Structure formats: structure tokens, C-alpha cells
């Protein structure tokens, strides 16, 4: 089941929310767990057994690690056992086909008989729920969270359906208190519903429209330079609006149930370095890789060379996490290389001013990386890169011109205009906040009457108007209700676009989120 489907919008979600708010507080986690299992089993019932098995295994390992004591040798042995089993499960389902195909290719080239292996189907969401389980037992070992004895709460954490399929990658230590003490208010529900609608619009209106353009360009056998760059830019925008749209929907659903998940995107395409990009893109994964892989490898301990090596290996393995394809490994190596170079050069990763040249170079590096990330194989990537950097015919091919519609062109323009507007706004807002902190450190700051300011805790990834965050309350000084009209107007616009998106969804074929494949 996916969020952008009629069965979820008009059957599953209304029934679940009705039962959720009619039930007592003590039964809500159990209801959430049951609903999440139904949500997952809607795809395939048989893989639900694997999902439950991984959950129970890590719950038991967590108890063993916790009983052995923080960072003790016995706890380390239990942790190692848990992580090895988790990685073996993930490795088999995600990489068995790739491994056997690679071995068979080598054996065939030597004239040997290849292995016979039935194709292994990848369970949806396995990369996310295995990583979340691993982070839990590591946190118990480190003493960052106690081992929970409540199986229902732990199982609900792993299975909670808003983030189950494609993240954000959550951590038990951040949600443990919310499972027992979360608040449910009309304002919070309204904020969540608005955030959900934002994500739905991103997915259906923008990402799905751009997907047609990207798919067509990447499928061309002889793309022109114009075709290749159009495809690269279309996919760059498609991936952001698709994945950040899913994250918005997940965060919104969480708010509707009283949970507050971490933000997953902070205007990544405004970044002026690859290091800054990874502070803004898929934040839940990048921080997971930092805390559980980079630090485990040694982090910045051991000198400069070891630091560069650990950065590179972390991103290399991060690329492999995305899938069993050499293209993902190269993509990870590409980002790892630039992270190491920026670290070695000592580039300023938190610039105070917006440097167009630095931004353009960073964006170019990101787009180049997305091309191989999107390509089915090295042949497709080579074909696209060859066309992009031949700087030959910038005209679109006849096939492309024949298929490209005015709506698709307009959507691409709107997508990048939106990225530019909110990205620059986010940059200068953050700079003003930093300046404000410096001013408060030097002396008392004064406010002019009638100042409109955002409430602390604004969601950085959400749509903003000056002084407002869609889905959040705003403080107005003085509190004239007239000053709130932009927020209500924006909510009305989002509702209108949401209804239009539902109508568009009904008219198009099924389009899953891109990160479902990972």
C-alpha cells in the first residue's frame, strides 16, 4: 500500500484514524502496530513473517545487550551477534542476485558452468527497518537508551506505517518517550494534515510529471546534448520532490498521530559544498551513517589520511546500501571522494554569504552523480555522460520534441523556481538567525512593534511565507487576526491543489515512490 493511492486515502487512513481517536490511550500503540502490519501485508503477506521475525530478534538481542551492561565484553558479543544476523538477512535479500550474477559472469568468461539461483525478491522497506533495528541495539550497547521490555512499543516503533517503506530512518531513543507520552491536539493534527497534503502535491503534481520526462530522456539510444541535460535536470528535480514529498507525508501522518519525526530535507539544492549537501539531503540516513558507520570506522581519529579514508568508505557503503548495482557503488564513491577532498582542502561548509560560483559547482557535481544513480547500468550512464559533455547538438531530438508537452515544460520551470525561491529564502533566514544570535550575545536586541516572527521549531523542509510556516502556528505582535491571512490563504491553496492532485491521481497509472526500490 502506498500513500498516493485511493485505497490508502479513502479507506485505510480514515478507518485507522477513526479507530485511533476512538480508542483509549493505552490501546493506541497496539492499534498502530496492527494497522502497520496490515499496511505492510497489503503488498505481500509472506514477507510479514520475515518482518516480525527481525523485530522479535532485535527485541531479544536488545534485552541481552542491556542485561550484560553498557560497553561490556559480554554486551559486545551479543551486539556483534545481532548485527551479523541483521546484515546477513539484509545481504541475502538485497545482494544475493547481484553476487551470483557477478560470480556467474566471471565463471562464464572462464568457460565454467554458472550457478543456478532462483531470483530473490527484495522485501519492501527491508533496508530501513533493518537499519533502525541495528541502531537500537547499538544505542543500548552504548548506553544511549535503555533496553525496552515492552514488545508492543518496540514492534510499533519498527513498524509504524508512516515511515515504514521509505523512511525517515528513525531511532528508538528519539521516539521512546513519545510512545508513552505524546500529545494529541487539533493544532497538531491540522499541522500534520497540511504537511501530508504538501507532500502529496509534491509527489503527484511535480515528481510524477517530471518522471515521464526523465524516463524518456534516459531511454533514448542516441540522445543529443540537450536531451541528456534535460533528462539529468528533470531527474534531479523529480528525485527531490518524490522523496521529500514522501518524507513530508510521513512526518504529517506522524503529527496526526501525535508523533514528531525528524526532518529529512533542508533545501539541499541550495548547498555550496558536498559536505553541506549531506547536511541537507536525506538527513536521517546521513546522520545514521555518521553515527553508526563513520564513527565505528574510526571517524576523525587516527590522523588526516584515516579521516579521508573513513569518509570515503562511509559513502561507498552508503551507495551500496541503496542497491545491488555497480552504479550505486560508483555514486557513493563519487560523493565520498568529494567529501574527502573538501575535508582536505578545509573548505568552509557553513558559508555566511551566497556564492553563485560555489553553488553552481556543487549543483553540477550533484547532478553528475544523479545521472549514474538513475542509470540502469554503466552503458546507459556512459551514453548519458557522453551526450552531456560532448557539447554537440543542444537541440532536443525529434523523438523528445514529439513527446514533450507544455505541462511537462511548465512543471520543470515551476519545480526549479520553487527550489530557488525557498532555497534562497531558507539560506537568508538562517543567516539572519545566526546574526540574531550574535547580536543577542553582544547585547539586548530590540523588536519593532508589529514584527511577525516564526514560532521556534519551524519545519525547515516545509513551504514558507515570510514570517510563517505552513502547518505551524505563528506569533503576531500585536495579535491582529488580519495579519494571519497569508497563512490561511496558503492553507486554502494547498487544500485546492491537494484536491486537484487526487483527481490527477485517479486519471494516471500507478506510480510508486522512487525510494521504494531501496
Swiss-Prot record:
A Pfam family annotated for this UniProt entry: MBOAT
Gene Ontology CC terms: plasma membrane
Highest taxon, organism lineage: Bacteria
UniProt pathway annotation: Glycan biosynthesis; alginate biosynthesis
Single Gene Ontology MF annotation: acyltransferase activity
Keywords, alphabetical: Acyltransferase, Alginate biosynthesis, Cell inner membrane, Cell membrane, Membrane, Transferase, Transmembrane, Transmembrane helix
Function: Together with AlgJ and AlgF, forms an inner membrane complex which probably interacts with the alginate polymerization-transport complex and adds acetyl groups at the O-2 and O-3 positions of mannuronate residues. Acetylation of alginate is important for the architecture of biofilms and increases the ability of alginate to act as a defense barrier.
Family the entry assigns: Belongs to the membrane-bound acyltransferase family.
Protein name per UniProt: Probable alginate O-acetylase AlgI
Organism: Pseudomonas syringae pv. tomato (strain ATCC BAA-871 / DC3000)
Record gene name: algI
Amino acid at each position: 500500500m502506498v500513500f498516493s493511492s485511493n485505497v490508502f486515502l479513502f479507506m485505510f487512513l480514515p478507518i485507522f484514524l477513526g479507530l485511533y481517536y476512538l480508542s483509549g490511550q493505552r490501546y493506541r500503540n497496539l492499534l498502530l502496530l496492527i494497522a502497520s502490519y496490515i499496511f505492510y501485508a497489503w503488498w505481500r503477506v509472506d514477507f510479514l513473517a520475515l518482518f516480525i521475525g527481525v523485530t522479535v530478534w532485535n527485541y531479544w538481542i536488545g534485552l541481552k545487550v542491556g542485561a550484560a551492561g553498557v560497553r561490556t565484553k559480554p554486551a559486545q558479543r551479543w551486539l556483534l551477534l545481532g548485527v551479523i544476523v541483521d546484515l546477513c538477512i539484509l545481504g541475502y535479500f538485497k545482494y544475493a542476485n547481484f553476487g551470483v550474477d557477478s560470480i556467474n559472469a566471471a565463471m562464464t568468461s572462464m568457460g565454467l558452468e554458472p550457478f543456478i539461483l532462483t531470483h530473490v525478491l527484495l522485501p519492501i522497506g527491508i533496508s530501513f527497518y533493518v537499519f533502525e533495528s541495528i541502531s537500537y541495539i547499538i544505542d543500548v550497547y552504548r548506553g544511549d537508551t535503555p533496553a525496552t521490555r515492552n514488545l508492543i512499543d518496540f514492534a510499533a516503533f519498527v513498524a509504524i506505517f508512516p515511515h515504514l517503506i521509505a523512511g525517515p530512518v528513525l531511532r528508538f531513543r528519539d521516539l521512546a518517550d513519545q510512545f508513552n507520552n505524546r500529545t494529541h491536539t487539533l493544532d497538531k493534527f491540522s499541522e500534520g494534515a497540511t504537511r501530508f497534503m504538501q507532500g502529496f502535491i509534491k509527489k503527484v503534481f511535480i515528481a510524477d510529471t517530471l518522471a515521464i520526462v526523465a524516463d524518456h530522456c534516459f531511454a533514448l539510444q542516441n540522445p543529443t546534448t540537450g536531451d541528456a541535460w534535460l533528462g539529468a535536470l528533470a531527474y534531479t528535480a523529480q528525485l527531490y520532490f518524490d522523496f521529500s514529498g514522501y518524507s513530508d507525508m510521513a512526518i504529517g501522518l506522524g503529527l496526526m498521530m501525535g508523533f514528531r519525526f525528524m526532518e529529512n530535507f533542508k533545501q539541499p539544492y541550495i548547498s555550496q559544498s558536498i559536505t553541506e549537501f549531506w547536511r541537507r539531503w536525506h538527513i536521517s540516513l546521513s546522520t545514521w551513517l555518521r553515527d553508526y558507520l563513520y564513527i565505528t570506522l574510526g571517524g576523525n581519529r587516527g590522523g588526516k589520511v584515516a579521516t579521508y579514508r573513513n569518509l570515503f568508505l562511509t559513502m561507498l557503503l552508503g551507495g551500496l546500501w541503496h542497491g545491488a548495482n555497480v552504479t550505486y557503488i560508483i555514486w557513493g564513491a563519487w560523493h565520498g571522494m568529494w567529501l574527502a577532498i573538501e575535508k582536505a582542502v578545509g573548505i568552509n561548509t557553513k558559508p555566511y554569504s551566497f556564492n553563485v560560483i560555489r553553488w553552481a559547482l556543487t549543483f553540477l557535481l550533484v547532478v553528475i552523480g544523479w545521472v549514474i544513480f538513475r542509470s540502469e547500468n554503466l552503458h546507459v550512464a556512459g551514453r548519458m555522460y557522453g551526450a552531456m559533455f560532448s557539447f554537440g547538438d543542444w537541440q532536443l531530438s525529434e523523438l523528445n520534441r514529439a513527446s514533450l508537452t507544455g505541462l511537462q515544460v511548465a512543471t520543470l520551470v515551476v519545480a526549479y523556481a520553487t527550489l530557488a525561491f525557498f532555497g534562497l529564502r531558507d539560506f537568508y533566514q538562517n543567516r539572519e538567525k545566526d546574526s540574531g544570535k550574535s547580536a543577542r550575545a553582544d547585547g539586548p536586541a530590540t523588536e519593532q512593534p508589529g514584527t511577525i516572527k516564526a514560532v521556534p521549531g519551524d519545519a525547515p523542509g516545509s513551504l514558507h511565507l515570510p514570517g510563517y510556516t505552513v502547518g505551524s502556528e505563528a506569533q503576531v505582535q500585536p495579535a491582529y487576526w488580519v495579519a494571519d491571512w497569508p497563512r490561511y490563504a496558503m492553507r486554502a491553496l494547498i487544500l485546492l491543489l491537494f484536491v486537484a492532485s487526487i483527481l490527477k491521481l485517479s486519471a494516471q497509472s500507478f506510480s510508486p515512490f522512487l525510494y521504494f526500490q531501496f
